[in-house]
Each structure stands twice: as structure tokens, then as C-alpha cells.
Curated annotation (Swiss-Prot):
Pathway info: Purine metabolism; IMP biosynthesis via de novo pathway; N(1)-(5-phospho-D-ribosyl)glycinamide from 5-phospho-alpha-D-ribose 1-diphosphate: step 2/2
Domain ATP-grasp: 107-313
Cofactor (UniProt): Mg(2+); Mn(2+)
SUPFAM superfamilies found in the cross-reference section: Glutathione synthetase ATP-binding domain-like, PreATP-grasp domain, Rudiment single hybrid motif
Protein name: Phosphoribosylamine--glycine ligase
EC number: 6.3.4.13
Catalytic reaction list: 5-phospho-beta-D-ribosylamine + glycine + ATP = N(1)-(5-phospho-beta-D-ribosyl)glycinamide + ADP + phosphate + H(+)
Gene giving rise to this polypeptide: purD
InterPro entries to which the protein is assigned, alphabetical: ATP-grasp, ATP_grasp_subdomain_1, PreATP-grasp_dom_sf, PRibGlycinamid_synth_ATP-grasp, PRibGlycinamide_synth, PRibGlycinamide_synth_C-dom, PRibGlycinamide_synth_C_sf, PRibGlycinamide_synth_CS
Amino acid sequence: MKVLVVGGGGREHAIVHKLSQSDRVEKIYCAPGNAGIGQLAECVNISVEEIEKLKEFALQNKIDITIVGPELPLVEGIVDEFERTGLKIFGPSKKAAMIEGSKYFAKQIMAKYEIPTGRFKAFDRYQEALKFLKETWYPVVIKADGLAQGKGVFIVRDFIEAKEVLDLMMKKRVFGPSGDIVIVEEMLYGKEASIFAFVDGENVLTMMTAMDYKKVYEKDEGPNTGGMGSIAPNPHIDKKTLNEIEEKILKPVVYALKKEGIVYKGVLYAGLMLTKEGPKVLEFNARFGDPETQAILPLLKTDFLEIIEATLEGKLKNLKLEWEDKKAVCVIAASKGYPGEYKKGFEIRGLEEVKEAFVYHAGTSFKDGKIVTSGGRVFGIVALGDSYKEAREIAYREIEKISFEGIYYRKDIAAGY
């Protein structure tokens, strides 16, 4: 079977790696891919936004299944485009991907179908939002409605901070049209959790749980990032909690979308807060998480391609997922300055020294025969162990073997577990 993976980050490297372990996969293409992915797949120089070109490539190369990594092409309607031409593609339709593409849409669905989430108000006018922020309790969370690469969520402690964020979104328009609608949400307290499930339109098959580390600095300080590390399984979720999440959140949202005339197929990712009142939804995403995927997929024993096919064919109820009885720890190495301004093009040394962990490339490329940095998050080291402590020790031991100018990573991933 020929498979095309769309994307070029650490998540896509983990997907390509998992696919490469399937006997049924003959050839993997990845668009655009990166320096690490290029060792397992043929990288194709087409960006994730170029849907028409991706479709042409899939047709010309007789691709059997396309798997979409990032959210942007999903929200832009890549699945609808491919299906129109009879191509098999894994991911939700444009309408279904709205669950991630518009936080306001997701909140409306949750409110209508009583899916547990924080109280909220949405504004499309600056003055109305400002008036509300003058009168509200603090802290609150302000979110851009649309896609913002994980950087459109702000916790604000007082009106001064709130006005700064509002100006950023609605006056300076740093997120462009994504900030045309702004959500003000109550602050939820507890432990964060990421839950992923395969959804075939009807059935929900939950994956291994995970926990990610969003803040750039240790002790969860500093600005939000796309994720600085992750661990799997999530130490705060037991069987009872997972069951509650499935019955009160995952299944109800799939049902709610169906009632609205939207069939959801692909991966559903619920970002949750485990509060004293039970799990509540922070956000929904329409794809695999990054960097959670890098911790989850190495633990998967079931053939990945088989799961993808069962999802597309509506046959998930016949499938049972099998997992390694181990813990996974993923530590992300980033460029100095990330998530703000950073320089690229630095040579990465020591990659071949890593023997006891997986290295999943994110912002890497080839230049003059050398692997160099090309993004904010450069790579992730993923180690498995019988305990979080063992996996953590291996991950940090291995990451020390790799260097590039300005390398930065958090030293507290999986600490205390």
C-alpha cells in the first residue's frame, strides 16, 4: 500500500515511523516532511496548504490512503477535496473540523448539548468585549476564535492585562481573521489532560491517554507554546475517569455533531481540565496532538494502518487497541527565543549518538549535506521505560548527546511521577 502523510513536524515523524512498522505499507510519501522523516519516507516538496497540488500528487502516484497531520489543511477542506476525486483520506471533513477551526462553534455545540465546559461569552465587537472585561471577575481566559498555532489562548489576571490581549487580537489583529471573534471564558482549575480517540462517524475508540507541557519554562511558567514535552499514559486518569470522559464528552460530541448533520471521521482530540466537579472541555481539536502523538504512538502494538482503515470503513467497533505496558516520556528541544523570535540554520550534531530513544524531527532540514535547524521546535526525544522515572532518565541522558547553537529544553518533563 502507498501512503501519503501530510505535514512536516514531530507528530508526522511519529506517524511515518509507526506506518513504517506495518507489513502492509510498501511506500510512504510525506509532504513536505523534514530531515528525519526523509530517512523513512520520500519527502515531497509540497506545503500543507497546497491542497490542489497534494491532490494531484495523490492521483498521479496512485496513493491508497492519505493521512493528514496538521489542522490547517483539515479546516481548509482537504478531506472534501480528496473525497470528491475518489481518494481515500483520513481526517474530518471541513464542516467537522470546525470543532477546532472555530472555538465559538465548539462552545455553541457544547452549550446546546450540555457537554461539560467552562462558562463563556463570545464577542465580535471590541467595545462590547471591553465593557464586559471591565465588569467581570478575574482571572479569566481570553481565546481567539480561529486557528492560532496553539498561541491564541491567554490567562489574564486583571483588566489591564485583558485590555492588552483584546487590543492584540481585535485592534492589532495579530491573529488576523482568527481574532475577529473573541471568547472570554471562566478559568478552570485542576490537572490538564489530552484524550485522543479514533472516530468512524459512529463509534469512538479511545487511545492511550497523555499529558502535555504547554508552557515554555519550567514549573509551567512563561508563554504558551505548541508543547514542550509530553508523557503517556496520563498519571492523573484512572479507568473510572476515562469512562466518564468517554460517556460525558467524547460520545456526546460525536452524537451532537451528527444531530447537526455532521459526520465526524478521523481523530478527535479533547483538551480537558480534570476539575473537582469532573472533567471539563478546554478545547477540541480535529487531529493528533503534537507532542502527545510522539509519546502515544511508540506504545501502540496494534497495526496503525489497520486502525486507519477501520476508521474510514466505519468498522471501529470490531477493533481492540493493544498497548505496551510501559511509560513514554517526550522532551522537546527548541530554538533559543521560541515561541518568540528565533534564528535558524544551525547545524545539529550528535543525532547518530542516540541509541536508546526515538528522535522525532520537527523543525529540521538538510543544508549542504548537514542537518540544520529550521523551526521553533526542532526535535523531540522519546524514551520508554517501566516507570516514568526510568523513561525520564533515558530521555534526558540521550538528549544531552545532541547539540545545536541555542538549544533549549525544559528539565522538568515527567518530574515527580
